[in-house]
Amino acid sequence: MKTDIHPKYVAAKIKCACGTVIETRSTSGDISVEICSNCHPFFTGKSKLVDTTGRVDKFKKKYKMK
């Protein structure tokens, strides 16, 4: 087998926008993410209200249906 063909597997820190830092190992070094399990709505149980009109509502509004 060939030697030294695999990438270096080094200690890395994953930094979230909320300030959480998770230490792990990676081939790419330090990683920055926007959302993690500490601030994601699925894991926290807090839902975010997204005020968007659905396709059906847009259709009804366009054709003035009730």
Curated annotation (Swiss-Prot):
<comment type="similarity">
    <text>Belongs to the bacterial ribosomal protein bL31 family. Type A subfamily.</text>
</comment>
<keyword id="KW-0694">RNA-binding</keyword>
<dbReference type="InterPro" id="IPR034704">
    <property type="entry name" value="Ribosomal_bL28/bL31-like_sf"/>
</dbReference>
<dbReference type="GO" id="GO:0046872">
    <property type="term" value="F:metal ion binding"/>
</dbReference>
<dbReference type="InterPro" id="IPR027491">
    <property type="entry name" value="Ribosomal_bL31_A"/>
</dbReference>
<keyword id="KW-0687">Ribonucleoprotein</keyword>
<feature type="binding site">
    <location>
        <position position="39"/>
    </location>
    <ligand>
        <name>Zn(2+)</name>
    </ligand>
</feature>
<feature type="binding site">
    <location>
        <position position="18"/>
    </location>
    <ligand>
        <name>Zn(2+)</name>
    </ligand>
</feature>
<dbReference type="InterPro" id="IPR042105">
    <property type="entry name" value="Ribosomal_bL31_sf"/>
</dbReference>
<protein>
    <recommendedName>
        <fullName>Large ribosomal subunit protein bL31</fullName>
    </recommendedName>
</protein>
<comment type="subunit">
    <text>Part of the 50S ribosomal subunit.</text>
</comment>
<dbReference type="Pfam" id="PF01197">
    <property type="entry name" value="Ribosomal_L31"/>
</dbReference>
<dbReference type="GO" id="GO:0006412">
    <property type="term" value="P:translation"/>
</dbReference>
<keyword id="KW-0862">Zinc</keyword>
<dbReference type="GO" id="GO:1990904">
    <property type="term" value="C:ribonucleoprotein complex"/>
</dbReference>
<feature type="binding site">
    <location>
        <position position="16"/>
    </location>
    <ligand>
        <name>Zn(2+)</name>
    </ligand>
</feature>
<dbReference type="GO" id="GO:0019843">
    <property type="term" value="F:rRNA binding"/>
</dbReference>
<dbReference type="InterPro" id="IPR002150">
    <property type="entry name" value="Ribosomal_bL31"/>
</dbReference>
<feature type="binding site">
    <location>
        <position position="36"/>
    </location>
    <ligand>
        <name>Zn(2+)</name>
    </ligand>
</feature>
<comment type="function">
    <text>Binds the 23S rRNA.</text>
</comment>
<keyword id="KW-0479">Metal-binding</keyword>
<dbReference type="GO" id="GO:0005840">
    <property type="term" value="C:ribosome"/>
</dbReference>
<keyword id="KW-0699">rRNA-binding</keyword>
<dbReference type="GO" id="GO:0003735">
    <property type="term" value="F:structural constituent of ribosome"/>
</dbReference>
<keyword id="KW-0689">Ribosomal protein</keyword>
